[in-house]
């Protein structure tokens, strides 16, 4: 009997009987409200932050934004409404009817029936001021508030769309996404610019390592991707990387995001360069199609003329020159460089930017670098006295180096000799073992995500394209 009563009770709760006739307002994002095809008085609810307040004799106008779009939704309310807390920056919930707007400035507007202030904002003390276009340098002081400005909001939406576009490109191309570790015992760059990890508090034990070996924040996921490329022919990762570089330049951060890929069974740089160019162009085209208003805002207020420069990059095939040719171009330049170009020396930022300009402001691949300039895993070209490796960098306008990559040394004895000369054989024995068991020709590349955003948007300082920039002597929040 008890079972029957429980069954009847459950049937009652699962009944298809209608709810009370009161129809709640449909919650919409500002973007969806602005894009509504039928603005015939549907009752809706939006939540967001006030971007502007304008009071007239009989009508009160608000513009409310929730971050879903650059454009705000105009809210029209009776002027008799208590507006004391309806300040710039206050968070609100608005219910009302979505109607066609009589103004040519917007297609729809929300006729408010109820406005609820969720959180008041004292506009006098708020560091972001109404109708004031703050310099990006000023906004860096307020990482907890700068996302509320139009420019940073646009950059962060573009960042989100670019992330999705990159994942989409790799998925459509048959790549497997690998989560490479943040904590590692390897230094894939060989530069020694590492953040070492130590436990704090009671776990801190002198003369011992938590992992029994020194551990660091990763500088690259490449070596772990190479492990995976022995089982999957195409792999990629997208995540944070860390460099303990004491640099305050406009291109460097201590924490940034990297897109890295490894491809098995490739034996030419041309194969890698084709994927790199396709990735850059496909991602950029997707960003331009998904958030044109945000890109337009950045180009208008941050980098006038960037739209034309970007279109120039997209419509032209990327160029290819060798490192040796690059050095000759620099030597013949009329420009005086701070660092004298010479064969065997690394290309500096001033050199990279000159080479791009020399090539008509089209992205240019520089290939076949001196062996001494690149890490131990780059494939030896066996090309005589100059001794180069099959490495490639992509240089782009305004930024310089954007991609770096190359063919990996898959031949056991070549790699063994390189490691022995560097005294790294014991540390990288596992890496050597990959060449003993089913090794294949393979190669890969990495792209700095923040530099990519700088490139397409024309943002001069890398600190302005990441939500919370980390750099020497600064770790706000």
Swiss-Prot record:
In-chain residues carrying the UniProt-annotated modification N6-acetyllysine: 353
Q: What is its EC number?
A: 6.1.1.22
Arranged from A to Z, the UniProt key words for this protein are: Acetylation, Aminoacyl-tRNA synthetase, ATP-binding, Deafness, Disease variant, Leigh syndrome, Ligase, Mitochondrion, Non-syndromic deafness, Nucleotide-binding, Primary mitochondrial disease, Protein biosynthesis, Transit peptide
The answer on whether this UniProt entry bears the keyword Calcium reads no
Q: Known InterPro entries for this protein? A: Aa-tRNA-synt_II (IPR004364), aa-tRNA-synth_II (IPR006195), aa-tRNA-synth_II/BPL/LPL (IPR045864), Asn-tRNA-ligase (IPR004522), Asp/Asn-tRNA-synth_IIb (IPR002312), NA-bd_OB-fold (IPR012340), NA-bd_OB_tRNA (IPR004365)
Catalyzed chemical reaction(s): tRNA(Asn) + L-asparagine + ATP = L-asparaginyl-tRNA(Asn) + AMP + diphosphate + H(+)
Which molecular function term from Gene Ontology is one that the record holds? nucleic acid binding
Q: Name one GO cellular component term.
A: mitochondrion
Q: Which cysteines are joined by disulfide bonds?
A: none
Q: Name one GO biological process term.
A: asparaginyl-tRNA aminoacylation
Q: Transit peptide: which range?
A: 1-14
Localization: Mitochondrion matrix; Mitochondrion
Q: What is the effect of changing residue 381 to D?
A: In COXPD24; uncertain significance; no effect on homodimer formation; does not affect localization to mitochondrion
Q: What disorder is listed for this protein?
A: Combined oxidative phosphorylation deficiency 24: An autosomal recessive mitochondrial disorder with wide phenotypic variability. Some patients have a milder form affecting only skeletal muscle, whereas others may have a more severe disorder, reminiscent of Alpers syndrome. Alpers syndrome is a progressive neurodegenerative disorder that presents in infancy or early childhood and is characterized by diffuse degeneration of cerebral gray matter. Deafness, autosomal recessive, 94: A form of non-syndromic, sensorineural deafness characterized by prelingual, profound, bilateral hearing impairment. Sensorineural deafness results from damage to the neural receptors of the inner ear, the nerve pathways to the brain, or the area of the brain that receives sound information.
Oligomer and partners: Homodimer.
The protein's matches in NCBIfam families, at most eight in alphabetical order, are given as:
asnS, PRK03932.1
Q: What is known about what this protein does?
A: Mitochondrial aminoacyl-tRNA synthetase that catalyzes the specific attachment of the asparagine amino acid (aa) to the homologous transfer RNA (tRNA), further participating in protein synthesis. The reaction occurs in a two steps: asparagine is first activated by ATP to form Asn-AMP and then transferred to the acceptor end of tRNA(Asn).
Q: Identify its protein family.
A: Belongs to the class-II aminoacyl-tRNA synthetase family.
Record-given protein name: Asparaginyl-tRNA synthetase
Q: What organism does the UniProt record list as the source?
A: Homo sapiens (Human)
What does the organism's lineage look like at the top?
A: Eukaryota, Metazoa, Chordata, Craniata, Vertebrata
Q: Which gene is the coding source of this polypeptide chain?
A: NARS2
């Amino acid at each position: 009997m008890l079972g029957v009563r429980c069954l009847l009770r459950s049937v009652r709760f699962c009944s298809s009987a209608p709810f009370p006739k009161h129809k709640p307002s449909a919650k919409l994002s500002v973007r969806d409200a602005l894009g509504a095809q039928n603005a015939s008085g549907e009752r809706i609810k939006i939540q967001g932050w006030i971007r502007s307040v304008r009071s007239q004799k009989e009508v009160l106008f608000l513009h409310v934004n929730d971050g879903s779009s650059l454009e705000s939704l105009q809210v029209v309310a009776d002027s008799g409404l208590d507006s004391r807390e309806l300040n710039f920056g206050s968070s609100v919930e608005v219910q009302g009817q979505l109607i066609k707007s009589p103004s040519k400035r917007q297609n729809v507007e929300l006729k408010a029936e109820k406005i609820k202030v969720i959180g008041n904002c004292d506009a006098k003390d708020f560091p972001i001021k109404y109708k004031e276009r703050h310099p990006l340098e000023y906004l860096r002081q307020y990482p907890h508030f700068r996302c509320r400005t139009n420019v940073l909001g646009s950059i962060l939406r573009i960042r989100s769309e670019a992330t999705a576009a990159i994942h989409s490109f790799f998925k459509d191309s048959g790549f497997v996404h690998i989560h490479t570790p943040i904590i590692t015992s390897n230094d894939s760059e060989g530069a020694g610019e590492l953040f070492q990890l130590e436990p704090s508090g009671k776990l801190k034990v002198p003369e011992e390592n938590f992992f029994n070996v020194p551990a660091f924040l990763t500088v690259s996921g490449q070596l772990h991707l190479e492990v995976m490329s022995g089982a999957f022919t195409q792999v990629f990762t997208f995540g944070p990387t860390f460099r303990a570089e004491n640099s305050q330049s406009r291109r460097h951060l201590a924490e940034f995001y990297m897109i890295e890929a490894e491809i098995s069974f490739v034996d030419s740089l041309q194969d890698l360069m084709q994927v790199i160019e396709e990735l850059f162009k496909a991602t950029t085209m997707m960003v331009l199609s998904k958030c044109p208003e945000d890109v337009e805002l950045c180009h208008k207020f941050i980098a006038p003329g960037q739209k034309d420069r970007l279109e120039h990059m997209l419509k032209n095939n990327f160029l290819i020159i060798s490192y040796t040719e690059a050095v000759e171009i620099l030597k013949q330049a009329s420009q005086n460089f701070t660092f004298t170009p010479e064969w065997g020396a690394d290309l500096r930022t001033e050199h990279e930017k000159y080479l791009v300009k020399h090539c008509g402001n089209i992205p240019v691949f520089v290939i076949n670098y001196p062996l001494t300039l690149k890490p131990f895993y780059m494939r030896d070209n066996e090309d005589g006295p100059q001794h180069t490796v099959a490495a490639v960098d992509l240089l782009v306008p305004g930024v310089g180096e954007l991609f770096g990559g190359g063919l990996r040394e898959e031949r056991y004895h070549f790699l063994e000799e390189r490691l022995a000369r560097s005294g790294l054989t014991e540390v990288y024995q596992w890496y050597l073992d990959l060449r003993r068991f089913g090794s294949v020709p393979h190669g890969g590349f990495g792209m700095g995500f923040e530099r990519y955003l700088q490139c397409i948007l024309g943002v001069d300082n890398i600190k302005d394209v990441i939500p919370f920039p980390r750099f020497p002597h600064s770790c706000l929040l």
